[in-house]
Structures are given as C-alpha cells and as structure tokens.
From Swiss-Prot:
Belongs to the CCDC124 family. It holds the Pfam family Ccdc124. The keyword ATP-binding does not apply. InterPro entries: Ccdc124/Oxs1, Ccdc124/Oxs1_C. Residues 44-82 form a coiled coil. This is Coiled-coil domain-containing protein 124. Its main location: cytoplasm. Keywords: Cell cycle, Cell division, Coiled coil, Cytoplasm, Cytoskeleton, Phosphoprotein. GO terms for molecular function: transcription coactivator activity. It comes from Pongo abelii. The modification Phosphoserine is found at S141, S194. Residues 1-126, 204-223 are annotated as: Disordered.
C-alpha cells in the first residue's frame, strides 16, 4: 500500500490565508468607520466653535471702536461748549453708515422745511366772495323799494344761485324712492317691483320734491 500523504495542501493553506486576511481587513475597516465618523463630526464642532469665537471677537472690537468714537465726539462737543479748542485726535477717514444717514436726514429736513419768508395771507389779502344779490341788482338794474320788489329780487337771486338743479336730482330721487316705495308696495301688493318703480317715476315727475319742478315754482307761490 502506498503511504498516506501527511503534508498540508499548499493551495488550501494559501486560500485560507487570503480569506483570513480579507476578513481581518474588513473587520478593521468596520471598526475604523465609527472612529472616523466621530473625528469628522468633532472637526465640524471645532470649526463652528472657532467661527463663533472669531465672530464674538469681531463684535467686541466693533463695540470698542464705537465707544472710542462716541467718547471722542463727546469730548469735542464738550470742548466746543467750553470755548476751548478741540483736542487734536487722529481720526479715521472712514465714515460710518449712521453718520451718512444722519447727514441725509438733516439735509432732507432743511429742504422740506417751509420758507419762513412765506406767510399766510391776511384777511385783507383774501378776495371777498361776490354778493349774489348785489350782482343781480347790478345786472338786472332792479331796486327793491317795496316788500314785493324785495321778494322778486330774492327769487331772482335764488334762481341765479341754483342754475343746475339736475345735479341734485339723483340724491333727491333716492330720498323720494326710500320714502314712497314702501307706501306703493302696501297699496299695490300684486304689482312687481318694475311696475312699482314705473308708478314711482310717474309720481316723481309731478312731485314738488323734484328739483326740476322746484325751479319752475315762483318764490311767493302758495304752499
């Protein structure tokens, strides 16, 4: 009988070694991923922290600069009030936005302010309104010597003052309709609204409330 081979198969050993190496690499990668993620996240926090620190320092420096500028302006103002010379301080040529806005606002107020030389017109400068009755007398050469003449003059003056009754006709008709339409509905319950409005219009043409009819009525006509 031939002897049994007791040595190790090199191919099998190499395959097992490769599998073990691949498994070890996969395990190492798997273990490293959480650590990398942790440090990556920690780097973000560090960057944000540094950014906040820089912004805070910038705000502090800006506030300090504004305080120095305010103090300088107060010292200059105080020196001017006392009549002394303002201290010679090396000022920055940079103009702040607040100073620009303040200058523009003052300039706008000066432009919008009314001219002090322009005064309100006195009662002597305002033209007097024309007396209608006097104009009627002058134009028509009517002189009121009696009561009847005065009534006639007033009637002419009233007619001259109200030459456009049609301008008041719409408002007068609206008031007439609101007052008379309920009565017509009660007296004619079977009529439609269009019929009632036709009837109302006929009454309006004859009504003394119509400005067109008032124009033709003489001033001293009996009521």
């Amino acid at each position: 009988m031939p002897k049994k081979f007791q040595g190790e198969n090199t191919k099998s050993a190499a395959a097992r070694a490769r599998r073990a190496e691949a498994k070890a690499a996969a395990d190492a990668k798997k273990q490293k991923e959480p650590e990398d993620a942790y440090w990556k996240d920690d780097d973000k926090h560090v960057m944000r922290k540094e950014q906040r620190k820089e912004e805070k320092e910038k705000r502090r420096l800006d506030q300090l600069e504004r305080k120095k500028e305010t103090q300088r302006l107060l010292e200059e103002e105080d020196s001017k009030l006392k009549g002394g010379k303002a201290p010679r301080v090396a000022t920055s040529s940079k103009v702040t936005r607040a100073q620009i806005e303040d200058t523009l606002r003052r300039d706008h107020q000066l432009r919008e302010a009314p001219d002090t030389a322009e005064k309100a017109k006195s009662h002597l400068e305002v033209p007097l309104e024309e007396n209608v009755n006097r104009r009627v007398l002058e134009e028509g050469s009517v002189e009121a010597r009696t009561i009847e003449d005065a009534i006639a003059v007033l009637s002419v003056a009233e007619e001259a003052a109200d030459r456009h009754p049609e301008r008041r006709q719409r408002a007068a008709f609206t008031a007439f309709e609101e007052a008379q339409l309920p009565r017509l509905k009660q007296e004619n319950p079977n009529m439609r609204l269009s019929q009632l409005k036709q009837l109302l219009k006929k009454e309006w043409l004859r009504s003394p409330d119509n400005p067109m009819n008032q124009r033709a009525v003489p001033f001293n006509a009996p009521k």
